[in-house]
Amino acid sequence: MDRIIEKLESGWWIVSHEQKLWLPYGELPHGLAANFDLVGQRALRIGEWQGEPVWLVLQHRRHDMGSVRQVIDQEAGLFQLAGRGVQLAEFYRSHKFCGYCGHPMHPSKTEWAMLCSHCRERYYPQIAPCIIVAIRREDSILLAQHVRHRNGVHTVLAGFVEVGETLEQAVAREVMEESGIKVKNLRYVTSQPWPFPQSLMTAFMAEYDSGEIVIDPKELLEANWYRYDDLPLLPPPGTVARRLIEDTVAMCRAEYD
């Protein structure tokens, strides 16, 4: 699937190594390969954006390596492709040897996979399913500060799906574990690939059912109900958490304004 980059090759360039992204001048490289000293490198076409190819190059650059978070304010489709590139680069880096027999692996020519010629095992990129849920109680929404994000941002609850668990069960369990409340009338909203490191966020809205807030201090600094027109600092636009909060606010405005 990969190829040698030629002088006149053009497009968007995802140059990635160890979950980092090359961001000269703080932006994704876009244009001719020759302008970015990429001629002769191997590249894998991982998608298309606005009619131009998006290329993945597995390479470390001495300067300007940053996090894919730095391009979160790009259009959603381009951010998604950047995340795909970083995740694929890490997949290829971490699967050089077979986990069953220890022999060297090689990339598939037909799909995003690594193959073992010795035992014929096949590996695919790992994707971790997560749930994220906005919980509404009349004119208020449940928002929390997470232990791992000590930046004053308040957001909705989220967590990983466990083995043998449905998405609906994961929502009920995570909400109970983190906040001590029960929810009802769960409704699917959307999903978002989230490359931190390799999650698929599955977003829901729910209504408060019963219980008082009792936080899990290992997960949350605090949690509270916030009226829709008096909200604290929120996650940035482009995140599925912000989408859920804005959708909940819109529902409240329709009923209470």
From Swiss-Prot:
Substrate binds at R69, E111, Y124, Q192, P193, W194, P195, F196, P197, Q198, S199, A241. A divalent metal cation 2 binds at E174. CDD domains: NUDIX_NADH_pyrophosphatase_Nudt13. Keywords: Hydrolase, Magnesium, Manganese, Metal-binding, NAD, Zinc. One of its GO terms (molecular function) is NAD+ diphosphatase activity. A divalent metal cation 1 binds at A158, E178, E219. Zn(2+) binds at C98, C101, C116, C119. Divalent metal cations. Mg(2+) or Mn(2+). Binds 1 zinc ion per subunit. One of its GO terms (biological process) is NADP catabolic process. Its cofactor is Mg(2+); Mn(2+); Zn(2+). Residues 125-248 form the Nudix hydrolase domain. Its EC number is 3.6.1.-, 3.6.1.22. It catalyses: a 5'-end NAD(+)-phospho-ribonucleoside in mRNA + H2O = a 5'-end phospho-adenosine-phospho-ribonucleoside in mRNA + beta-nicotinamide D-ribonucleotide + 2 H(+); NAD(+) + H2O = beta-nicotinamide D-ribonucleotide + AMP + 2 H(+); NADH + H2O = reduced beta-nicotinamide D-ribonucleotide + AMP + 2 H(+). A divalent metal cation 3 binds at E174, E178, E219. SUPFAM superfamilies: Nudix. A motif (Nudix box) lies at residues 159-180. mRNA decapping enzyme that specifically removes the nicotinamide adenine dinucleotide (NAD) cap from a subset of mRNAs by hydrolyzing the diphosphate linkage to produce nicotinamide mononucleotide (NMN) and 5' monophosphate mRNA. The NAD-cap is present at the 5'-end of some mRNAs and stabilizes RNA against 5'-processing. Has preference for mRNAs with a 5'-end purine. Catalyzes the hydrolysis of a broad range of dinucleotide pyrophosphates. Belongs to the Nudix hydrolase family. NudC subfamily. Homodimer. This is NAD-capped RNA hydrolase NudC. It comes from Salmonella typhimurium (strain LT2 / SGSC1412 / ATCC 700720).
